[in-house]
UniProtKB/Swiss-Prot annotation:
Recorded coiled-coil stretches: none
Any GO BP: glycine betaine biosynthetic process from choline
Catalytically driven reaction(s): choline + 2 O2 + H2O = glycine betaine + 2 H2O2 + H(+)
Species per Swiss-Prot/TrEMBL record: Alcaligenes sp
One GO molecular-function entry: choline:oxygen 1-oxidoreductase activity
Details of cofactor binding: Contains 1 FAD per subunit covalently linked to a His residue.
Record protein name field: Choline oxidase
Record keyword Oxidoreductase present: yes
Length: 7
């Protein structure tokens, strides 16, 4: 999971 991949 990448928590910094939110758009």
């Amino acid at each position: 999971d990448n928590p910094n991949h939110s758009r």
